[in-house]
């Protein structure tokens, strides 16, 4: 084993190294969420906007599309796996508190792993419903874009059909609220892990974390709420 490989192995197995990897993979996912939200909000522009956006990735070569999906999947799995590892190690090393009120951690940080696992369960369901499109017959969800010249799957109709189910919308909204709690602590942790942490700047990045989480989550929630209220139909 050469020195470089040994250094890499030492880094990825150390507590600090894994925290940095969690922060970097978390940053990738945070940025992905922003892009995903921007695409989702195109539904307010009407069927043409959202269907054109959704058709874009599917116009790519199949191998390239699944390569991107696989890359995101690997980033997500690494993030979840290392987070659980660090949480379990931290719990094992920490002595139990005699009094609960001595715990100074925020609710977001204390329940980080649970909100994350809730989001994971939701993600599996979300992929099953909207990426694999299980239960949606392509023959009934076909439309045309680009002035009727390109045939594509009707994502607009699929979203309206899905969120017209109150229970589906309720589960989505609950998961997004869990995501807010997760993002609030996660974004704060990214700043801390990369060394941007001082008493002067801490209130600023705490505000950024809360604001970012709120914008992302309110944006996602606006879609099912608008469907249920008949704004999107």
Pin down the residues of each PLM region.
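Membrane-embedded alpha-helical bundles that constitute the cytochrome b-like, heme-associated redox core
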Residues: 1-233
């Amino acid at each position: 084993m050469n020195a470089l490989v040994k250094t890499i192995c030492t880094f990825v197995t150390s507590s600090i190294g894994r925290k940095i990897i969690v922060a970097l993979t978390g940053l990738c996912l945070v940025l992905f969420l922003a892009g995903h939200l921007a695409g989702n909000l195109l539904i307010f522009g009407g069927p043409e906007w959202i269907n054109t956006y959704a058709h874009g990735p599917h116009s790519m070569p199949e191998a390239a599309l699944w390569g991107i999906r696989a890359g995101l999947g690997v980033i997500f799995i690494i993030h979840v796996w290392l987070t659980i590892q660090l949480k379990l190690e931290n719990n094992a090393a920490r002595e139990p508190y005699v009094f609960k009120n001595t715990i100074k951690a925020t609710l977001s940080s204390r329940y980080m792993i649970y909100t994350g696992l809730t989001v994971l369960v939701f993600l599996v369901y979300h992929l099953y419903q909207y990426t694999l499109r299980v239960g949606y017959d392509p023959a009934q969800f076909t439309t045309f874009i680009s002035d009727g010249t390109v045939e594509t799957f009707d994502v607009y109709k699929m979203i309206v059909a899905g969120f017209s189910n109150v229970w589906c919308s309720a589960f989505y909204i609950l998961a997004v609220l869990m995501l807010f709690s997760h993002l609030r602590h996660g974004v704060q942790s990214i700043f801390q892990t990369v060394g941007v942490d001082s008493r002067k700047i801490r209130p600023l990045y705490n505000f950024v974390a809360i604001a970012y989480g709120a914008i992302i989550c309110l944006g996602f929630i606006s879609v099912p709420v608008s469907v249920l209220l008949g704004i999107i139909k």
